[in-house]
Amino acid sequence: MSQERITVTSPLLPNLDEFNEMLKEIWASKWITNMGQFHKQLEQALCEYLKVPYISLFTNGTLPLLTALQALRITGEVITTPYSFVATTHSIWWNGCRPVFVDIEEETCGIDPDKIEAAITPKTTAIMPVHCYGKPVKMQQIQAIADKYGLKVIYDAAHAFGVEVDGESVLNAGDMSTLSFHATKVYNTLEGGALVMHDEQTKKRIDYLKNFGFAGETEVVAPGINSKVDEVRAAYGLLNLKQVDQAIANRQKVAQKYREALRNIPGIRFFDDMPGVRHNYSYFPIFINAEEYGKTRDQLYFEMREQNVLGRRYFYPLISTFSTYRGLPSASPANLPVATRLANEVICLPMHHELTNEDVERILKLIIK
């Protein structure tokens, strides 16, 4: 274990001198929070970069999920995926709704739209799909189902910063989309997130809800929360936006090296780029068929850790196996065969903009040997 540690990710950091200059501006203005100039600039810059009409910044990636459900007044049951980070389902639970798990597709690890209709009941009010690993789900098919049954669609797009299909941002699908700007993501604001919406009226409502419900100095129009982004994180985000394209390009090169080396290794499967999709290379999951590969996922995972190579088993275990949710009828493994199998096969390899050729070679040697 003497070799230097290779982590699964590494945060994109702005130039420290440039950041210090922006901090001086904040100190001089004494406007630290409450939608200051850098907050406004970042919202505008993100709208332009992401090709979306309206965006509202949040202090993390979970609060946009909670707020979207509140803003759309979602009740009853929400159809979602068990193969995600727990915040997806927790946001449903915290809003007093019942999550209903639907199995996933093997080719994207996203919710399988062919299985959604069977999960709809008179209590269903919304669908919350996830663009897992930044791979777009079948949005048109999901929207057709939502339109047929009068359901809202909220996309958890935490992994999908900058992802486009045929030149159109995936964030424009559904009723709203949420983003995470956590330090582990392709683009980060230290901690942060955002909610994307389609019209000015909804933008105003979201901005009220994230500011205690205030619509003016003395008027409260809704029971809101406090999830405003401060000027320090907004400044940090503005600087990171200038370098995110280069970071994604670096990630793409790593993905290409992984694919070239692993393509013909028995028992290892991975995703190729999807036609017409602009990917962000946020993750590089591989799936281990133990019989063909000669060892289990966990054997490889712990062997890598012993050599200071820290992959992650995203997403194991399934959300549906946690104590809060395992009693739900939809949480049964028999209802989720694809998700259950993939959760036991997956390892996300190290993937970030700072990986060197030597790092990648070291990782690949551990897998190929």
Locations of regions flagged by a protein language model:
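Structural detector of well-ordered beta-strand residues that form the stable sheet scaffold
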Residues: 56, 79, 100, 153-154, ...
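PLP-dependent aminotransferase-like
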Residues: 70-148, 152-157, 164
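Phosphate-binding glycine-rich loop
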Residues: 31, 35-77, 83, 91-94, ...
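Short beta-strand-to-turn element immediately C-terminal to the catalytic PLP-Schiff-base lysine
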Residues: 179-180, 193-199, 238
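PLP-dependent aminotransferase class I/II
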Residues: 37-45, 49-53, 114, 118, ...
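Glycine-/small-residue-rich active-site loops that bind phosphorylated ligands and cofactors
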Residues: 84, 107-108, 134, 185, ...
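N-terminal "arm"/small-domain region of PLP-dependent enzymes with the aminotransferase-like
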Residues: 1-32, 350
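Conserved active-site segment immediately N-terminal to the catalytic lysine
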Residues: 155-189, 204, 216-221
